[in-house]
Every structure is written in C-alpha cells, then in structure tokens.
Amino acid sequence: MRITELFGRVKHRYLFILAGMLLFLPPLNLIPQTVGETNMCGKVCPRLFLILSTKGIASGALSNVQAMWFGVGLVATVLIITFFFGRLWCSHLCPIGGATELIGRLIPARLKISFAKIDAPAFRYGYFAVFVAGAYWGAGNIACKLCSYRVIPFLAGSPFEPAYAAYLSTSMGMAGLLTVALSGFFAKGGRAYCNCLCPVGAVDGLANYLSSKFGFTKKVRTDPGKCVGCGQCVTTCMVWALKKPEATETVQRDTLSCVSCMECAKSCPAGAIYYGKRQK
C-alpha cells in the first residue's frame, strides 16, 4: 500500500501515535536501544545538534552531527517525507507531540488554555533563533533541560527508573515539566509546544511551506470553490493553522503551522478539505 493510500484510509491517527510512543519511549525504548541509548537524548536527540557550538560554527556543527548522528538522520528522513507528503511525522508518529496530545485529551475542556491569539510562526522562529544561538548566549543548556524530548521520556520512564523521577523533582526538572504541561497537556489541542517551541517543528514547517508551492507534492489543502466559510475547521485545528478573516468568505490555511493531521477534514461539512496535489 502506498503511503498516500495509507494516509487516506486511516480514520484515527492514534494507533500510529501509540506505535511511535512504544518505539521511542520507556519502558520499551526500542529504537533508542538499537543505538545504545536509554532515552531520546544523546545520539538519538533530533534537536540538540541544531544548537551552535562555541567551538566555531563549522567545526561545532560537524561535531554535533557526529555526536548525534541518529537524530540528524531522523530529522533528514522527516524532512524528506514532509517535502513530498506533508508533516506525517508530527501528526502521526512523533512520540512527544503525540503524548502531549493524547494526555491533553484526558483533561477537561474547561481547564484548557487557548494559545490561538499567538502569532505562532513569529513566536516559533523567534524562539528557534534563540535556540540555535543558545550556546553563545548561555541558554543552550536551559533549552535542553526544558526540552519536551527530555521531559516526556523522563516522565514515561520515571516509574521504572528512579533517576528519572529524581530529576523531575529538581527545580530544573519541575520547570521543564511545567513548560510541557502548560504548552502541551493543558493547551487546547495539546500541541502548543509543537507549534511554538519545537525546533524540529520549525524546520519541518519550513519544508512543508516551501514544498507546498510545487504542484507534484501532496499536502492537506482547502478547495476554495467548496469552502462555505462556516469556520468549523478553525475550531478543530490543534495548531490554529486555519483562520477565517472577516474580509474573505473562505478559510485560509497557514502551511508553516499545519501538521497534516486531517482533523479539519473530519469536521468540514462541505468536503472542502482534501489531501493531495494542488488543484489547477
């Protein structure tokens, strides 16, 4: 079965998300263990290699790539898939964003925080700039400690590994847990961390935006000829990538933020949202 057919037939993403969690997170850690790691830090980390090193940009970048080669390969694979098929990693397989979304669904709606008023791309790429240059400004270590790719695996592994529970009880561990809780578990849609703070999401969003300009790539798109402007998809979008400007009759999609989850398509009464190539 081709990946596009699989994407179109799956009614629920959660089986894929659970599979991603089983592969990457404790207690199984199946993929990290293949390269000698116990969590998503070290060689498996898909984020830390992006931080500029004080050793020098070129030599530091090479050192980062060598140290975190699996994470580099993972990000490269994600970007290739995103270019041709949309952000399937973020919406269907990422164990971190998937965990915050699933846990968030267990929390009552009245306790949820809406981040929809935040200009996500502006915030995301501002933070991304700080993240990349963090070592020079002394913030690299802090970004690592607050990273959801650290907090979620430690949280999942804390019942099995006392050291993880001990870390989460420290001031830095609690700060990281609070960051993930507010921007993940208690965020409306469960994906505010993904949309505003994730460095992988930042580069993945750029790949999705740029590749959407090509007619041969397959993305989640809106057919303006069918859109009735009801706005139901806007309220469904977990990353507030859909807007209904007052001056227009149709919904606008921000491909920098869209994670290709297709939840909007499920809520569209007019069938205006589809997954495929750009219509001519």
Q: Can you annotate each of these PLM segments?
A:
Residues 1-251, 256-280:
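Non-ligating segments of multi-cofactor redox enzymes
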